[in-house]
């Protein structure tokens, strides 16, 4: 028989791992750190340039911030994010593989049990 409780537990662990990867304290603190730095930097730039609600200024600020301060750190941060995305996809593929493999094994064992029951029925009757 297929164990549906185990499959639900596997799905819950996938969801838990997904939330653990995204909402780690390191990722949240980095996000808020970048957000605060961007807000301070954009406020100073907008104050100097007297152009307040222009999206191009904010775009230039982001590009300038990444090119001045963050090329090395930006590449490391992208590798960090891509690594966790790869780990997440690999975990999902492993869980799908084990889900299919467990169904396949349970079917094989059930077939063996049914064959054994049929043979015992034939032998003793």
Swiss-Prot record:
Compartment(s): Plastid
Organism superkingdom: Eukaryota
Keyword annotations from UniProtKB, A to Z: Plastid
GO annotation, cellular component aspect: plastid
Keyword Plastid: yes
The protein's name in its UniProt record: Uncharacterized 15.6 kDa protein in rps12-trnP intergenic region
């Amino acid at each position: 028989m297929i164990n549906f409780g185990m499959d639900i537990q596997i799905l819950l662990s996938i969801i838990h791992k997904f939330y653990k990867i995204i909402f780690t304290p390191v990722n949240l603190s980095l996000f808020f750190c970048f957000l605060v730095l961007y807000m301070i930097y954009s406020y100073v730039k907008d104050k100097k340039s007297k152009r307040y609600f222009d999206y191009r200024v904010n775009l230039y600020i982001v590009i300038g911030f990444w090119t001045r301060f963050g090329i090395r750190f930006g590449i490391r941060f992208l590798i960090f994010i891509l690594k966790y995305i790869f780990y997440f996809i690999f975990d999902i593929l492993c869980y799908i593989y084990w889900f299919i493999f467990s169904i396949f094994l349970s079917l094989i064992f059930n077939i063996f049990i049914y064959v054994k029951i049929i043979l015992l029925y034939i032998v003793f009757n």
